[in-house]
Amino acid sequence: MIIDGKALASDIEAEVRERVERLGFNPGLATILVGENPASQMYIRIKHAACERVGIRSENIVLPGDTDESTLIKTIQGLNKRGDVHAILLQLPLPGHLDPRKAMMAISPEKDADGFHPENMGALLLGAERLVPCTPRGIVYALEHLGVDIEGSEAVIVGHSNVVGKPLAAMLLNRNATVQVCHVYTRNLKEHTKDAEILVVAAGVPRLIKADMVRDGAYVFDVGINKVDGKTVGDVDFDAVKEKAAGITPVPGGVGPLTVAMLLSQTVTAAEMSLERQRS
């Protein structure tokens, strides 16, 4: 089975529209783009188009590529103070002279659309999932939507980034999966992946995972986006692995749409949290 990320994202967007209607106002998302990275510009356009579809008011703040740290932090602090901005997203990567960790820590935890703030990451590790990284949240949503029994399952994640691998491991542990986290430095990677019932690959290595590394009937989520001979491919040898997997996400059209849809959901969550604070 091909796991259609676009179809799942459409379901999420329908849920988000209903939540926006119940709120009675349009939540606000502010994105910050530093520089003119073409890929980042494309991702920003995709996110703002998605906001428009579900009734989220969005604005994009573009800063020059030579923006200094002080200016970026002040821009974020200004958005923190605005009542009409419920969620803030800092588009990564930043230019090399800027420290993404300092910038992320400047975002108010209550407005942290990406779930990268240490306070939100800490809550996740303690089992309190408030605002969490969007890609892991999308993967967990897909597993639950497909009726996969996460509890007790053998889950292997290839990739230990702060964006995908680490937070996804915490989310799966919170649901009582048995989790292994591997990476490109793992010795004998096949020995780990071949028994996985849930396999998530986010290593940034084109077609790293071959068919003989995958268990029959596994659910495989390919987070990789790589360019090979002008084509976009993932970290999984899709054509070979799809014959063995119970479900597999394509690249493109798999995890990417889920990530964007979860950004919308988290923006509404941030607005709902803001409303609760006002009422209490």
From Swiss-Prot:
Pfam families: THF_DHG_CYH, THF_DHG_CYH_C. Pathway: One-carbon metabolism; tetrahydrofolate interconversion. Catalyzes the oxidation of 5,10-methylenetetrahydrofolate to 5,10-methenyltetrahydrofolate and then the hydrolysis of 5,10-methenyltetrahydrofolate to 10-formyltetrahydrofolate. Its EC number is 1.5.1.5, 3.5.4.9. NCBIfam families: PRK14176.1. SUPFAM superfamilies: Aminoacid dehydrogenase-like, N-terminal domain, NAD(P)-binding Rossmann-fold domains. This is Bifunctional protein FolD.
